[in-house]
Amino acid sequence: NLSSLGADLFTGACHKWMMTPKGSTFLYVNKAFQRMLDPLVISWGFNSTTPSHSSFLDYHQTQGTRDFSAFLCIPKAIEFMNQYNWTAVSSACRDLVKSNALRFCELVNSQPLAPLTDDFILQLFSIPIKTKNPIQLKNLLFDQYKIEIPVMPHGDQVFLRYSIQAFNTQAHLDTLYDAVSDIIKTTNLIEID
């Protein structure tokens, strides 16, 4: 309940962790701050000739051709998560992330960016890697090993990030580990000091 939480602003993308369709994101703005927030794109609700009870809602109203079905899935996703004890599912996912983090760091001769605790590790882990060609590495993982995973440059570093959802298992992480190990042995894409 965001109003009882007392948040000024709160936004969430629900498509990954709540398994709703892409585009199902929400924005909550405390009434005290609604006048300060203008939409990036305006549509028919902006300066409407027939305003509703809320100029904030009017200003953020989207075009009539927008498909709202993704947003309408959010309540059912919350119901699904409650029904299937998603707190326990998420905890098991975090445990799987944490139990593999050091193994991957050792493989690429790296260190975790933060302590391996629930305060820092949710359902994903970014492994600092040394590569001069992150795009080629990402493409190789996909083309040869059929693994879709972010290989992301950030500043002067590159990160390989895995994430775990309810449908992932240790076998998936073993497949990734074996692929990275093979790439280290057969290419010069990942540098090991």
Tell where the protein language model's regions lie, with residue ranges.
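Conserved PLP-binding catalytic core of the aspartate aminotransferase-like
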Residues: R94-K98, L107-Q144
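Short acidic/glycine-enriched loop/turn segments that link adjacent beta-strands
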Residues: P21, D119-I121, D156-V158
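Glycine- and other small-residue-rich loops at beta-strand/loop junctions that grip anionic moieties
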Residues: K16, Q63, Q165
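PLP-dependent enzyme catalytic core of the Aspartate aminotransferase-like
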Residues: N133, N139-D193
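Conserved PLP-dependent catalytic core of the aminotransferase class-I/II
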Residues: S69-L113
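Active-site PLP attachment segment
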Residues: L5-T50
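PLP-dependent aminotransferase class I/II
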Residues: I42-N82, S99
